[in-house]
Structures are given as C-alpha cells and as structure tokens.
Amino acid sequence: MADAEDIQPLVCDNGTGMVKAGFAGDDARAVFPSIVGRPRHTGVMVGMGQKDAYVGDEAQSKRGILTLKYPIEHGIVSNWDDMEKIWHHTFYNELRVAPEEHPVLLTEAPLNPKANREKMTQIMFETFNVPAMYVAIQAVLSLYASGRTTGIVLESGDGVSHTVPIYEGYALPHAILRLDLAGRDLTESLMKILTERGYMFTTSAEREIVRDIKEKLAYVALDYEQELETAKSSSSIEKNYELPDGQVITIGAERFRCPEVLFQPSMIGMEAAGIHETTYNSIMKCDVDIRKDLYGNIVLSGGTTMFPGIADRMSKEITALAPSSMKIKVVAPPERRYSVWIGGSILASLSTFQQMWISKAEYDERGPSIVHRKCF
C-alpha cells in the first residue's frame, strides 16, 4: 500500500433498504435499493435474454414480474449469495471500477455478529481481490460526519434502529440498544391504515408507492393528542397524493399517525420502548460522568429520522425524562440520510487512517479473524 495516495478508496454503506456507494472524498454517486429480484415465471419471453437475477433499480423497475428479496434484514446480512450480487453490481455496474485496484471501506450495524464481519472480510479479499479493506460501525461514521467524536447516535434506517453512545470515537457496546422498528415497519403500518380506508396496497410493488407517500407527506406531531383533535376539527392537514394510475387519494391524520409509531410502538402491537425512551435508556447504561456529554450531543441519523418535526419532539420527550437541570441538544443534520456514507468518506480520506486498513498480505497471513484485531 506504499502508493496509496493516488488510489481513491471506495466507500460502501450497505443499508437494509438502500446501498450508498462512491469514492472517498466525493459524494455518494451510487444510491440504489438493496434488492435482488428473480423472475416469477421462467422464460416467458423467448429471446429476450432474461437474466436470472436483477439488482437495485433494474429490479425495482421490473418489480411487476419479479419476486423481490432484501439480502439485509434488520441491518444485518442474512443472504450472502444475494449480498455478493449486490456488491458485484455496486463495483462493476454502478461505480464501474475494478475492486482489485481500490481499498474498500464497508459499514456494519452495531452489534453485528463476529461471524458476519469475518464473512464480509473473506468475500472482499477472496471474491473481489481487494488490496485492502476496513469495516466501520455505521453510527460512529454518522457521528464523525456531524463533526463530533462524543455523543449518542439515534440511527433509524429502513430495517432497524439503534441508539449508540460513543465516547472519543469508540462505541460503548454495553450501552448500545437495538429496536427492531424502522422505516419498513412504518411503511407497513401506513399500508394497513390505508387499507382500512379502502385503498388496497398489498404487493411488494405497491409497498413502494406507500413508501413514497410516507416520505413525501408524513411528519411527527409535537403533541400527538392535540394533533388528533386538530385533524378531527379541520381539514388543514389534509394533502392529496396522485397514484401511478391517476387516482388521487387524500391523506389527513395518517400523515402523523404513521411516524408516531416510533414514539409509541404499542400502536402496532410492539412491546418495545419508543425511540425517545430507548435513547434515554442507552444514556442511563453509560457511566454517570459522560451522560452530560451524551445529553448535549444527541445526533439523528438515517432515512427514518427525516420526518419533519422529529427533532423537536425528541427534544421534548427526552427533556421530560432527563434530570431537570440537564442541557439537552438534539442535532438533526440536513444530510443525515447519507451521514453514514459521508462519515465513511471522511474517514477513508484521512491521512491518519491509512495505517488502519487491513491489507491483503495481513489477510493472507491471518485469515478472516484479522478483522476483529484491526476494526473496532
């Protein structure tokens, strides 16, 4: 890795819902759905050169004839063959690079099982022949992207949410909490709400429409009960949405009922604590001396934290739980949808980081377990 200066590292953030990839120092140039689609019916169209699998946007656009699968569930890779297809697509089709020429920085969910980190490492070196790689925890990268090294990150993506307290750049594993409630559950719950109103959304293709409704129209109420009253008495919060077939639907209270689930998981029958309480519980698992630093640096990250109103509501709820004199600051960076990727891009560009990479030589000598020694 002597001539590492002129070789741009690749940064690939594999989320449950979206892959974000690109070159360190740039913006994420490839953002596409983490899906692999396979034809439901084999070879209906002779001579069409039908592929046995489609990845990302192509799978998305042909979703009508495919069965769609997400290889990452709740933030953790569950199907390695499909995951390999996604990485192959990322390098060769999206970024159009030869992976054997670039160091690769991958991201992982907090508390990712050890065997999974080893498998990622193995695939990178043995299948893609990368010269060097590194695995970084997603929340830590988000915190770097916000210009901090200490704070607590509430990460909520499509498949999973975590609260991750970080002190001087190191995640504190004993205080990390996982909540299996995230964007996909909110989409599902909105599908149910709309179905109760007589709009049928059932297939995986229709789920994507509902996801779009959620992303465009949903918001978090500062006071849920009061917002419900407002919704009953006036039509001020109603908005129209045009479906692909031209039908127009009106959504009102659903706009804030949908993300309210983050604060009240019992609304969809989950026994878990809401994101505000989980954040508080995470802080309380930390040493009393660092809590003040955590309360003052609560950083939101991931697509499911993009709802308007979420930061104010978080601030209100945590203020109610915390000691009364505590200064509470919730930070919602505008680019938080991509902050994991941005943090990876920053990290991989640092001159001080260059000795952190796991090289091919080290891998050949030690095997996949090297990842636990070098990435923590």
Curated annotation (Swiss-Prot):
Q: What is its EC number?
A: 3.6.4.-
| Record keywords, A-Z | ATP-binding, Cytoplasm, Cytoskeleton, Hydrolase, Nucleotide-binding
Catalytic reaction list: ATP + H2O = ADP + phosphate + H(+)
Q: What is this protein called?
A: Actin-2
Q: Which family does it belong to?
A: Belongs to the actin family.
At the top level, the lineage of the source is: Eukaryota
CDD domains, from UniProt? ASKHA_NBD_actin
GO cellular component term, pick one = cytoskeleton
Record-linked Pfam families:
Actin
InterPro entries assigned to the protein according to its UniProt record, in alphabetical order = Actin, Actin/actin-like_CS, Actin_CS, ATPase_NBD
- Give the matching SMART domains: ACTIN
Phylogenetic placement of the source organism: Eukaryota, Viridiplantae, Streptophyta, Embryophyta, Tracheophyta
